[in-house]
């Protein structure tokens, strides 16, 4: 259902938001790349809430440029 897709998007977005808030600490500590984050959460978030994905996609690109990823 649409509600389930939205709930899944929210669940997938939370770890991304937390990592953005702590300047990518977990991503750096665990060697997580930008591509890996996008591959893991992008499709699910976009399917459930395209506006949220557009926002996160832009923030993830800023994080990549700032060197917040581990690999």
Where are these regions (language model features)?
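Alpha-helical, largely C-terminal catalytic domains
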Residues: 1-71
């Amino acid at each position: 259902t649409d509600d389930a897709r939205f709930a899944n998007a929210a669940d997938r977005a939370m770890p991304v938001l937390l990592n953005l808030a702590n300047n990518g600490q977990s991503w750096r500590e665990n060697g997580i790349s930008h591509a890996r984050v996008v591959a893991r959460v992008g499709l699910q978030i976009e399917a459930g809430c395209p506006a949220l994905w557009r926002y996160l996609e832009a923030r993830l690109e800023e994080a990549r440029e700032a060197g917040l990823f581990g690999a």
